[in-house]
Amino acid sequence: MARITVEDCLTNMDNRFQLVLVAAKRARQLSMGHQPRVAEENDKPTVIALREIADGHVGREVLDEVVAEEHAAVSSRISEDEVRAEL
């Protein structure tokens, strides 16, 4: 396993801040069971996410994806009015 550097990933990202957001979201997806797009090689999800970015398999588009679980979590929140009615 070769070490992944920020410079390896920045060739496919606009800036470091975007890189952090994309890597974090992709690592979260991998932790939740999404299939890696590169060989796992016994790496942690964060390293796999960075390798995917460096290889060009994952880009900014991952930020635009709305996962069903995320949507369900937002839609299932109790409204403030419902809480007040309970009190």
UniProtKB/Swiss-Prot annotation:
<protein>
    <recommendedName>
        <fullName>DNA-directed RNA polymerase subunit omega</fullName>
        <ecNumber>2.7.7.6</ecNumber>
    </recommendedName>
</protein>
<keyword id="KW-0548">Nucleotidyltransferase</keyword>
<keyword id="KW-0240">DNA-directed RNA polymerase</keyword>
<dbReference type="Pfam" id="PF01192">
    <property type="entry name" value="RNA_pol_Rpb6"/>
</dbReference>
<dbReference type="InterPro" id="IPR003716">
    <property type="entry name" value="DNA-dir_RNA_pol_omega"/>
</dbReference>
<comment type="similarity">
    <text>Belongs to the RNA polymerase subunit omega family.</text>
</comment>
<dbReference type="GO" id="GO:0000428">
    <property type="term" value="C:DNA-directed RNA polymerase complex"/>
</dbReference>
<dbReference type="GO" id="GO:0003677">
    <property type="term" value="F:DNA binding"/>
</dbReference>
<dbReference type="InterPro" id="IPR036161">
    <property type="entry name" value="RPB6/omega-like_sf"/>
</dbReference>
<dbReference type="GO" id="GO:0003899">
    <property type="term" value="F:DNA-directed RNA polymerase activity"/>
</dbReference>
<keyword id="KW-0808">Transferase</keyword>
<comment type="subunit">
    <text>The RNAP catalytic core consists of 2 alpha, 1 beta, 1 beta' and 1 omega subunit. When a sigma factor is associated with the core the holoenzyme is formed, which can initiate transcription.</text>
</comment>
<comment type="function">
    <text>Promotes RNA polymerase assembly. Latches the N- and C-terminal regions of the beta' subunit thereby facilitating its interaction with the beta and alpha subunits.</text>
</comment>
<dbReference type="GO" id="GO:0006351">
    <property type="term" value="P:DNA-templated transcription"/>
</dbReference>
<dbReference type="InterPro" id="IPR006110">
    <property type="entry name" value="Pol_omega/Rpo6/RPB6"/>
</dbReference>
<keyword id="KW-0804">Transcription</keyword>
